[in-house]
């Protein structure tokens, strides 16, 4: 637009009629806020990706995620920079307006000049107002030139400030064929576990055996066959998992429990004396055989007791009781109560000391620490209450110390 052909009334009127620089400053603040949010989002993405791929996540899925999200993070950073630049240019446009506004002649001054000219012309009967009319016209010409210069400068500054870099749309980070690819990956991932699952029953059968060497050999062979077929990414995933502290602690606890069940006590341990660390472990499914008590109808062949595991004599029919029998009016009396006939026989189950392992006394347990469990617990009688032998004490007893000699 050629602002030189427009009178000062139009140029000054346009400059003073607008809303001013307020909208441009508000736009600059909005662009700055958008730039800050985009920058924070890009930084959060970078931090999350670095933490995931740096210590906890590796493999094809991690690589695919990084490849998909990297363009998006770059777009966020570039858009944040463009938004910040837009805010700066909005401030530049506001500054250009303020400068042009200061250079523009106020409309009241222009109106006063025109009113003075009309008055001088109206009273110029004998030519006495000719010099004043010329001066008034000269002032008006200066106003014209000043407004035109201000508008030309403002137009140039505004054109530079409004030259923004075009914004681009966010990149597409998903694949249209992702669902089909995921279905194919699911089908392919179910094939290898079928072969692995087929070996589980065999391993469980070997685990139920008391022999450790075949079980260890089979487990070692199974691990070798399966681990050697892993891809480098899968091996890297296993290595990363083994590097996590809580994963190692969990494996250590699992191995310790297996060792506690697999390793019996020392054959020559003192049992309840606790002279050996291994004496505190056992009994397990791998515990050696021991002699079971003689059972009616079996257990001893030719006067020699047959070695049986611990659980055999724990399920002794004689200890548990015979067949079920009942009769009417045959109950025994315990004071004013009627009790079953075998009440006295069953009372031995209430006293742990009355039901003992093979042998006549507690010393029969000594020397068998290789298959004992938590030896050394004292046996307490359950036939009588010992609560009356204790006296309840409340509060606390104060200890009074004498004044030491060095205290004076």
Curated annotation (Swiss-Prot):
The chain crosses the membrane at residues 56-76. GO terms for cellular component: plasma membrane. It is a single-pass membrane protein. One of its GO terms (biological process) is response to host immune response. Keywords: Cell membrane, Membrane, Transmembrane, Transmembrane helix. InterPro entries: PPE_C, PPE_dom, PPE_sf. The keyword Transferase does not apply. Its main location: membrane. It is found in: Cell membrane. Gene3D superfamilies: PPE superfamily (1.20.1260.20). Belongs to the mycobacterial PPE family. This is Uncharacterized PPE family protein PPE45. The gene is PPE45.
């Amino acid at each position: 637009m050629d602002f030189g052909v427009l009178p000062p009334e139009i140029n000054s009127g346009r400059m003073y009629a607008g809303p001013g620089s307020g909208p441009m400053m508000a736009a600059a603040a909005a662009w700055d806020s958008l730039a800050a949010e985009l920058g924070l989002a890009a930084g959060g993405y970078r931090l999350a990706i670095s933490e995931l791929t740096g210590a906890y996540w590796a493999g094809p899925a991690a690589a695919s995620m990084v490849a998909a999200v990297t363009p998006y993070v770059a777009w966020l950073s570039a858009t944040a920079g463009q938004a910040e630049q837009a805010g700066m240019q909005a401030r530049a446009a506001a500054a250009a307006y303020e400068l042009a506004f200061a250079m523009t002649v106020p409309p009241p001054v222009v109106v006063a000049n025109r009113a003075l000219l009309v008055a001088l012309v109206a009273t110029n009967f004998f030519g006495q107002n000719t010099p004043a009319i010329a001066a008034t016209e000269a002032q008006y010409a200066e106003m014209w030139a000043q407004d035109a210069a201000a508008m030309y400068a403002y137009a140039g500054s505004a054109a530079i400030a409004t030259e923004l870099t075009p914004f681009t749309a966010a990149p597409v980070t998903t694949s249209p064929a992702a669902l089909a690819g995921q279905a194919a990956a699911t089908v392919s991932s179910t094939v290898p576990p079928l072969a692995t699952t087929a070996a589980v029953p065999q391993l469980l059968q070997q685990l139920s055996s008391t022999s450790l060497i075949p079980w260890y050999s089979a487990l070692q062979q199974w691990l070798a066959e399966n681990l050697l077929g892993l891809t480098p990414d899968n091996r890297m995933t296993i290595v990363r998992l083994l590097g996590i502290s809580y994963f190692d602690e969990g494996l250590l606890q699992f191995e310790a429990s297996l060792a506690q069940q697999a390793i019996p006590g020392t054959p020559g341990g003192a049992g309840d004396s606790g002279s050996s660390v291994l004496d505190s472990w056992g009994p397990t499914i791998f515990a050696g055989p021991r002699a079971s008590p003689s059972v009616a109808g079996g257990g001893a062949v030719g006067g020699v007791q047959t070695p049986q595991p611990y659980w055999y004599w724990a399920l002794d029919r004689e200890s548990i009781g015979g067949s079920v029998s009942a009769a009417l009016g045959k109950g025994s009396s315990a004071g004013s109560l009627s009790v079953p006939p075998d009440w006295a026989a069953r009372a031995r189950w209430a006293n742990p000391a009355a039901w003992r392992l093979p042998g006549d006394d507690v010393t029969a347990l000594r020397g068998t620490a290789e298959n004992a469990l938590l030896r050394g617990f004292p046996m307490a009688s359950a036939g009588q209450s010992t609560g009356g032998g204790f006296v309840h004490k409340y509060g606390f007893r104060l200890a009074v110390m004498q004044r030491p000699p060095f205290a004076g």
